[in-house]
Structure formats: C-alpha cells, structure tokens
C-alpha cells in the first residue's frame, strides 16, 4: 500500500507527515498533483475544489474518490456570530463527467472551539476572506465557540 498526501498549506503537510510518516507528502495543488497518470486507486479530497481533469488523470480506471464537502449546518453558529443574516450551506446533487456517483453519507456533530484556536479555524474557512470587520471582531471577542459541524462524504467511481 502506497499513500501520498498533498495540500497547498505547508503546515498541514508537516502535520500529516508527523501523523502518518509512512506516507509521502508534498505541498501541491489539487489541480497539479505530483504523481504519475493512473497511479491512484483511491483519492480523498477534503474541502478542496473538484479538479476534475486532474482527478481523471491520477485515478486508474475504476478508481474511486471520496469528495468531502460541507453539509448544510457546517459551522452555522460561527456564521451566526460573523454575519447579521447567517445562512445554511447549499446542498447540491452534483454530477461530474467521467465519474459515476455510487454513494453518500453525512456525518454531523457539535464541537467547542477554545478562544486560542478560533482564529486558526476561521482562517481555514472561506468566511475569512469575506467577513466584515465587525463580524471578525465579534468572533475574536468570544471565550469559545460551540458550533455544529456537518460533512458530506460523496463517493465516486471513475468510468
């Protein structure tokens, strides 16, 4: 079994390498993975854009991909702090040419994030780039945040 992992964030790659040293890691984009064509039996893509052409290239015929996207309630309470009108994430049924959807599962829970980790969590979200300053200030003032988390695991097979 050979494992490889890629992320555009160098700290994430370092953390993964410490957690599972038997795998190989690289700082790389989903759109340009440093592996040969047809190398992968399974891809796991978490909260990254769907790089369809690159996934097609990297997966062997019949290979599978788990695509993790946020569920409707993911970080809803964080959005309630950041925005005057919080919103649920859209849940869409998607079809990608060259892939066949073969399953889906949603996992939900609640987490409490201490103050010293709130900024790091916030920085990993798209909200970081589009939140007004007053919303950012409200989040920074919290001693902790309890929020829902929701992940949709979409399973695809390469045709």
Task: Give each language-model segment a name.
Residues 62-75:
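Conserved beta-strand signature within the Rossmann-like core of class I S-adenosyl-L-methionine
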Residues 41-45:
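Hydrophobic beta-strand segment of the Class I
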Residues 47-61:
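A short, conserved alpha-helix within the catalytic core of class I
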Residues 10-11, 50-53, 73, 113:
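Short alpha-helical
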Residues 14-15, 35-38, 75-81:
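Short, charged, surface-exposed secondary-structure boundary motifs
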Residues 1-33:
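Class I SAM-dependent methyltransferase SAM/SAH-binding core
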Residues 72, 79-101, 107-159:
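Conserved Class I S-adenosyl-L-methionine
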């Amino acid at each position: 079994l050979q494992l490889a992992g890629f992320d555009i964030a160098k700290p994430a790659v370092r953390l993964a390498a410490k957690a599972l040293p038997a795998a190989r890691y690289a700082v790389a984009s989903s759109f340009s993975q440093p592996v040969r064509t047809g190398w992968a039996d399974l891809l796991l893509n978490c909260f990254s854009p769907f790089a369809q052409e690159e996934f097609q290239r990297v997966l062997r015929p019949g290979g599978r991909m788990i695509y993790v996207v946020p569920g409707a309630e993911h970080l809803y309470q964080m959005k309630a702090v950041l925005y005057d009108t919080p919103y649920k994430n859209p849940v869409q049924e998607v079809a990608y040419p060259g892939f066949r959807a073969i399953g889906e599962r949603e996992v939900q829970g609640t987490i409490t994030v201490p103050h010293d980790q709130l900024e790091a969590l916030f920085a990993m979200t798209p909200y970081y780039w589009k939140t007004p300053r007053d919303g950012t200030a409200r989040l920074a003032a919290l001693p902790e945040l309890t929020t829902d988390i929701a992940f949709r695991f979409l399973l695809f097979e390469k045709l």
